[in-house]
């Protein structure tokens, strides 16, 4: 009897999670169904904000977390800085260690030249992503601190919206 009740509760919890996630994705899909997709992403590191634009129309503003050393240009692998410059959204990853991930085309040619002049590897795998799938801290930590290795992180709900409102190969400009 207890085993059956436990399985019933687990199945019920799973169903609730699926329905809640499905409802959130459906709402976002309905939101994006108006046909308006962003054609440009802008990040202002000093503001901890990501902006989505369609032409000159501001579509959304999202709070972001950055690398553990958020001030300054990324110069090399493992410096925990978020890059600054002109890049593109390169590809999407649903199997990331984080809730959804969109790769940023860092390093660009200037980044590579700058790093190699100093004898460093420029690093890579800069992503826009949600919170970790296996978190080590409460959500409040990820919401209020810079915690990434250099990536741009959003809450999971904001990540769904950014995912649905963008396409690959659109520009992303990251400013100090």
Give residue ranges: language-model regions.
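N-terminal secretory signal peptides that target proteins for export/translocation
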Residues: 1-7
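Bacterial N-terminal signal peptides
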Residues: 11-24
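N-terminal post-signal-peptidase region of extra-cytosolic proteins
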Residues: 31-39, 46, 66-91, 109-114, ...
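Exported/periplasmic cell-wall-interacting domains
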Residues: 36-37, 91-176
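Well-ordered beta-strand positions in beta-sheet-rich domains
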Residues: 40, 61-63, 86, 125, ...
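Short Gly/aromatic-enriched secondary-structure transition segments
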Residues: 57-69
């Amino acid at each position: 009897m207890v085993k059956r009740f436990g399985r019933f509760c687990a199945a019920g919890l799973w169903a609730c999670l699926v329905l809640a996630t499905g409802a959130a994705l459906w709402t976002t899909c309905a939101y994006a169904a108006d046909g308006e997709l962003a054609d440009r992403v802008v990040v202002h590191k000093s503001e901890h904000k990501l902006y989505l634009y369609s032409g000159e129309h501001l579509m959304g503003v999202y709070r972001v977390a950055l690398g553990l050393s958020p001030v300054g240009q990324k110069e090399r692998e493992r410096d925990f800085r978020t890059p600054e410059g002109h890049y593109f959204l390169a590809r999407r990853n649903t199997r990331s260690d984080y809730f959804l991930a969109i790769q940023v085309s860092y390093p660009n040619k200037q980044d590579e030249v700058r790093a190699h002049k100093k004898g460093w590897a420029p690093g890579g795998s800069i992503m826009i992503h949600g919170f970790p799938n296996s978190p080590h801290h409460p959500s409040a930590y990820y919401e209020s601190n810079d915690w990434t290795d250099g990536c741009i992180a959003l809450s999971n709900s904001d990540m769904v919206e950014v995912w649905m409102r963008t396409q690959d190969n659109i520009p992303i400009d990251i400013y100090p």
